[in-house]
């Protein structure tokens, strides 16, 4: 069970409060604005968090001074734990990125704790463990944290009533994690086959025992799911709207970028006029969970990722060191763009640059 500080909810920051051309970000806040008193049951401590706003005053000098990683050993020796994103860092689609096995082996040999965090909710932790194994990587299930798991862990952290149900817009990973956590659910891939036949006076029914709608990446997304989720959120008192992530794009294959989970979440935002509670990166829920579980000091963590608005912001929100790799969605031109307000501590071409005391030139 998580500490109450970890159990605080994630609340969205209004897009009107952001700098021009920056993307919405999320921070921890009490759930009191989203849940009925009957749901809360006193399990959530009210915390007077102010929404995090990206302004010139809180972009720190440290964040403004990105350096190319030149001394890999110095960074490695300065932290105890490395948190790695997966897509674009460890693999692209189903292809392993060059040098990854040797890099992970080297870090383990140096006594470093390795954790793998992904916003991809299509698989459970166990299923991700099999993917690591298929790619020839020796990774323990306890080292893997997917946003599918984060959704179930979040519901556990707020003592979500076991007599309430969760409607899932997403794939098998979310269903498996909810089942392992002991929650009732409906929806998922099966609802991808459902269609709505509109007739005069037609009224779509929905389950009034649904207390949360969880939205993640969904290749079976359709109008039925949008309407069902909308009805639950708008008509069931205290119903939570939870998003595993708001990633704009994802890597289903290594050939191109594909529309990400944010496109599914956006549809529900539009229909409900509600902002979701985001449990994946860049919200600090998973970072707080990991720090709580492993007893990690956040100052002793380096977050390694390929996305500025999720991975790097995730690390910065958690007070960690950050390393951007250019093996995924972010290019050097995007990093150096005047419009980019999210600057990592370091950047390099790929994680195998750790193998050289003097990192490769980008």
Curated annotation (Swiss-Prot):
Q: What class of enzyme is it?
A: hydrolase
**Any single biological process term in GO:** photorespiration
Top-level division of the source organism's lineage: Eukaryota
Q: Which residues form a coiled coil?
A: none
A matching Pfam family: Hydrolase_6
Q: Where are the transmembrane segments?
A: none
What this protein is reported to do is described as:
Photorespiratory enzyme that dephosphorylates the 2-phosphoglycolate produced by the RuBisCO oxygenation reaction.
Q: Which family does it belong to?
A: Belongs to the HAD-like hydrolase superfamily. CbbY/CbbZ/Gph/YieH family.
**Protein name, entry field:** Phosphoglycolate phosphatase 1A, chloroplastic
Source organism of the structure: Arabidopsis thaliana (Mouse-ear cress)
């Amino acid at each position: 069970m998580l500490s109450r500080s970890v159990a605080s909810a994630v609340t969205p920051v209004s897009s009107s409060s952001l700098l021009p051309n920056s993307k919405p970000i999320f921070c921890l806040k009490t759930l009191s604005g989203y849940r009925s008193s009957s749901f809360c049951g006193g399990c959530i401590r009210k915390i007077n968090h102010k929404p995090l706003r990206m302004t010139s005053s809180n972009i720190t000098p440290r964040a403004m001074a990105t350096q190319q990683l030149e001394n890999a050993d110095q960074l490695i020796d300065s932290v105890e734990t490395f948190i790695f994103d997966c897509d674009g860092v460890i693999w692209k689609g189903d292809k392993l990125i060059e040098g990854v096995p040797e890099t992970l082996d080297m870090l383990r040999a140096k006594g470093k704790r390795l954790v793998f965090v992904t916003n991809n909710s299509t698989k459970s932790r166990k299923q991700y463990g099999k993917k690591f194994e298929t790619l020839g990587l020796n990774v323990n299930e306890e080292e893997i944290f997917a946003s599918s798991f984060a959704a179930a862990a979040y519901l556990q952290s707020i003592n979500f009533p076991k007599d309430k149900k969760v409607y899932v817009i997403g794939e098998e990973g979310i269903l498996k994690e909810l089942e392992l956590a002991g929650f009732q659910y409906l929806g998922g891939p099966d609802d991808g086959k459902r269609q709505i036949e509109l007739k005069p006076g037609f009224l779509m029914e929905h389950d009034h025992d649904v207390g949360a709608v969880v939205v993640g990446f969904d290749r079976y997304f359709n109008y039925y799911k949008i309407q069902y989720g909308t009805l639950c959120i708008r008509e069931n008192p205290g119903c939570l709207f939870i998003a595993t992530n708001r990633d704009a794009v994802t890597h289903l294959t290594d050939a191109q970028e594909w529309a990400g989970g944010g496109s599914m979440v956006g549809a529900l935002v539009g229909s409900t006029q509600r902002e979701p509670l985001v449990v994946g990166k860049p919200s600090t829920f998973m970072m707080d969970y990991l720090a709580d579980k492993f007893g990690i000091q956040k100052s002793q963590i380096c977050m390694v990722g390929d996305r500025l608005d999720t991975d790097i912001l995730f690390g910065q929100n958690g007070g960690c060191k950050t390393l951007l790799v250019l093996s995924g969605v972010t290019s050097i031109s995007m990093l150096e763009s005047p419009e980019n307000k999210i600057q990592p501590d370091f950047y390099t071409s790929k994680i195998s640059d750790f193998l050289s005391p003097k990192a490769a030139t980008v």
